[in-house]
């Protein structure tokens, strides 16, 4: 397999970053993406490598649907921009980032209100906190924001125990993201009755097949989301969503517009709120426009691959 590194600016700061970097790898089955965030060490990156290898060399399970419903993603922007993002998305569900650095509670309320107004009464609004609140703040803010009829609240607090306590104290469903994808034991969310919904992301979980196994073991409704990837990475998320037996919620896979560019001539963009289930091919010209020196990413990939091989050699529980 050969790899090529990329760096693509984001339109708006997202998860504290302004540029999305990674590596695209081509194998017998097609293209795979390896794009763990900068703070992740080799052991955490190992699962991202496994997902990339699966996409490039093994391919994905057969789909059970041809399209995947998706939500608009609204970063920490002002209310006017939030409304514009939703109106131009074609989606009837929106996920709104709240509790971001530099944003006040008043900013969050105004953003969620603007999204609700843009969607109308039949649209669905969910918020994503990325674990930023403590329990009491979470309970207070969820009750405050639920006047906009929240579909669910994603990762209001950082720990599983906190999620469980918040879930007991509010009526809005709770979704777990970081407590699944960054956990040594992702099933603890289920065992602690800490969530109503689980958010699964292909790269952090080690691939489509690994995520399907986790979904089956967990037994909770699943939302598939992206890790702010190019169309290559998004195609893996679409493959997971397409292979799930049930898909009760819109998925967080319409994130390509967060990037200033893509690597495909035919990018994975939603039409009328859905994404098609398909592989993508990388455009040589578009990749060349965002390509960077691969040395640092080759080193990260090699370390992740070595860590994955070590994990594979370890005895099971």
Curated annotation (Swiss-Prot):
- State the disulfide connectivity: none
Active-site positions, per UniProt?
97, 201
**Gene3D superfamilies assigned:** Enolase-like C-terminal domain
The effect annotated for residue 73 to A is: 2-fold decrease in catalytic efficiency
Annotated Mg(2+) binding lies at: 128, 154, 177
Q: What is the effect of changing residue 73 to V?
A: 1111-fold decrease in catalytic efficiency
Reaction(s) the record says it catalyses: (1R,6R)-6-hydroxy-2-succinyl-cyclohexa-2,4-diene-1-carboxylate = 2-succinylbenzoate + H2O
Any idea which UniProt keywords this protein has? Lyase, Magnesium, Menaquinone biosynthesis, Metal-binding
One GO BP on record is:
amino acid catabolic process
Checking Pfam families in the record gives:
Enolase_like_N, MR_MLE_C
InterPro entries to which the protein is assigned, alphabetical: Enolase-like_C_sf (IPR036849), Enolase_C-like (IPR029065), Mandel_Rmase/mucon_lact_enz_CS (IPR018110), Mandelate_racemase_C (IPR013342), OSB_synthase_MenC1 (IPR010196)
Pathway it belongs to? Quinol/quinone metabolism; 1,4-dihydroxy-2-naphthoate biosynthesis; 1,4-dihydroxy-2-naphthoate from chorismate: step 4/7; Quinol/quinone metabolism; menaquinone biosynthesis
Q: What is its EC number?
A: 4.2.1.113
Effect on the protein upon substituting residue 73 to L: 2-fold decrease in catalytic efficiency. 33-fold decrease in catalytic efficiency
Q: Which cofactor does it need?
A: a divalent metal cation
Tell me which residues bind 2-succinylbenzoate.
71-73, 95, 128-130, 201
Top enzyme class of this protein? lyase
Entry's Gene Ontology molecular function annotations: magnesium ion binding; O-succinylbenzoate synthase activity
Similarity comment: family membership:
Belongs to the mandelate racemase/muconate lactonizing enzyme family. MenC type 1 subfamily.
Q: What does this protein do?
A: Converts 2-succinyl-6-hydroxy-2,4-cyclohexadiene-1-carboxylate (SHCHC) to 2-succinylbenzoate (OSB). Does not show N-succinylamino acid racemase (NSAR) activity with N-succinyl-L-phenylglycine as substrate.
Q: What is known of its domains?
A: The 20s loop, a flexible loop in the active site that permits ligand binding and release in most enolase superfamily proteins, has a four-amino acid deletion and is well-ordered in T.fusca OSBS.
Q: What PANTHER family does UniProt report for this protein, alphabetically?
A: O-SUCCINYLBENZOATE SYNTHASE (PTHR48073:SF2), O-SUCCINYLBENZOATE SYNTHASE-RELATED (PTHR48073)
According to UniProt, the name of this protein is: o-succinylbenzoate synthase
Q: Which organism is it from?
A: Thermobifida fusca (strain YX)
Question: Which gene name does the record give?
Answer: menC
């Amino acid at each position: 397999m050969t790899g090529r590194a990329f760096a693509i600016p984001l339109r708006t700061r997202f998860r504290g970053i302004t540029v999305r970097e990674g590596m695209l790898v081509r194998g017998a089955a097609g293209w795979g993406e390896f794009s763990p965030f900068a703070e992740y060490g080799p052991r955490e990156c190992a699962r991202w490598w496994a997902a990339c290898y699966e996409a490039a060399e093994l391919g994905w399970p057969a789909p059970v649907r041809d399209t995947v419903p998706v939500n608009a993603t609204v970063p920490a922007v002002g209310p006017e921009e939030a409304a514009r993002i939703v109106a131009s998305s074609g989606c009837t569900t929106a996920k709104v980032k709240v509790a971001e650095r530099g944003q006040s509670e008043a900013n969050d309320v105004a953003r969620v209100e603007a999204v609700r107004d843009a969607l109308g009464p039949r649209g669905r609004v969910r918020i994503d906190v990325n674990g930023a609140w403590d329990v009491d703040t979470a309970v207070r803010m969820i009750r405050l924001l639920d006047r906009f009829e929240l579909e669910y609240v994603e990762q209001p607090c950082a720990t599983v125990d906190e999620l469980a306590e918040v879930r007991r104290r509010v009526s809005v469903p709770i979704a777990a993201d970081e407590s699944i994808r960054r956990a040594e034991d992702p099933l603890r969310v289920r065992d602690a009755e800490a969530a109503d919904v689980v958010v699964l992301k292909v790269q952090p979980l080690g691939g489509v097949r690994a995520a399907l196994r986790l979904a089956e073991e967990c037994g909770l409704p699943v939302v598939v989301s992206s890790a702010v990837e190019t169309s290559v990475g998004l195609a893996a998320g679409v493959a997971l969503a397409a292979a799930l037996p049930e898909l009760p919620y819109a998925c967080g896979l319409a994130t390509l517009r967060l990037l200033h560019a893509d690597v495909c001539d035919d990018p994975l963009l939603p039409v009328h709120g859905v994404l098609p289930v398909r592989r993508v091919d990388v455009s040589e010209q578009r990749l060349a426009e965002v390509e960077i020196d691969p040395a640092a990413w080759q080193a990260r990939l090699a370390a992740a691959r070595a860590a994955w091989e070590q994990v594979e050699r370890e005895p099971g529980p």
